[in-house]
């Protein structure tokens, strides 16, 4: 919460009334990853839960694969990457099942003390 408060104070000219909106467009807000890939109760799920999230948008090219494995996605890559964490193992399994990564938009409304859209 401290980071939200610091941004709230620093960007005071961007508030609407006493509310500041924080908007995010990310693969980290893609609901199927939250459900099946991110470790249960982990930081990525906690991050997701801060937001009101829009409809998920699948991306069959899996363009954010590199963010996890530092290489471009290809079906062959699934057998070559090092799946040494729960998230990496879950993502490889998820993609081998024919599912794809994607993205969504999220918003947080903060009033200077708390997130008010939860």
What are these regions (language model features)?
Residues 1-11, 22:
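Conserved acetyl-CoA-binding loop-helix of GNAT-fold acetyltransferases
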Residues 14:
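Conserved kinase catalytic-core segment
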Residues 17-118:
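Terminal substrate-recognition subdomain of acyl/acetyltransferases
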